[in-house]
């Protein structure tokens, strides 16, 4: 109806913010195939989080831009992010993905198999990421994706940057914890760790970072 106040679509509810509208548009612009949707359903079944479609599309693009021959992932989950990363990697690229939960790795492996991804293109490692990462070679990865417990983000950033070759990209998911990291009044352990990870990236002169407001926040940085 002409002249209607559009500040709220639902009586008593605040109108969505510009950021919320942009995020909804970004998410709605991405369509996922049946394999990704099935992997996402399995993530719900086993109680593990998964990147949103828009974050997945960003990962695919960054994997392609970085060269995508060697990618490391901290936090396998149900394989949703792995599928997106592999979609942007080169045909002979190898995804090394780490998770402490064997069930996550099993479900992710099922998703990779259903997508027709050969076993030579994935390396699934069960263990604590802090320990596994120290065994990976310096300057050897095109992209490192961190999607694990926010408390440990600073450790993963330090190790992840070490792994990057020149021109490689580190990507940290849940970099804003929704809007919590940006609220000065919030100072719990998770937020403190996320802010420390962001500080480490911002103060590393080898890195050029950008914070992307998708999902729970994506902090990406390319290494000189």
From Swiss-Prot:
Keyword Cell cycle applies: no
Coiled coil: none
Positions with biased composition (Polar residues): 1-11
Keywords: Methyltransferase, S-adenosyl-L-methionine, Transferase
Region (Disordered): 1-20
SUPFAM superfamilies attached to this UniProt entry: S-adenosyl-L-methionine-dependent methyltransferases
Binding positions (S-adenosyl-L-methionine): 51, 73, 75-76, 81, 99-100, 149
Residues annotated to bind substrate: 147
E.C. designation(s): 2.1.1.-
PROSITE patterns: SAM_OMT_I
Matches recorded under InterPro entries: Cation-dep_OMT, SAM-dependent_MTases_sf, SAM_O-MeTrfase
UniProt GO MF annotations: O-methyltransferase activity; S-adenosylmethionine-dependent methyltransferase activity
Pfam families: Methyltransf_3 (PF01596)
Top-level taxon in the UniProt lineage: Bacteria
Family indicated by similarity: Belongs to the class I-like SAM-binding methyltransferase superfamily. Cation-dependent O-methyltransferase family.
Entry protein name: Putative O-methyltransferase MUL_4520
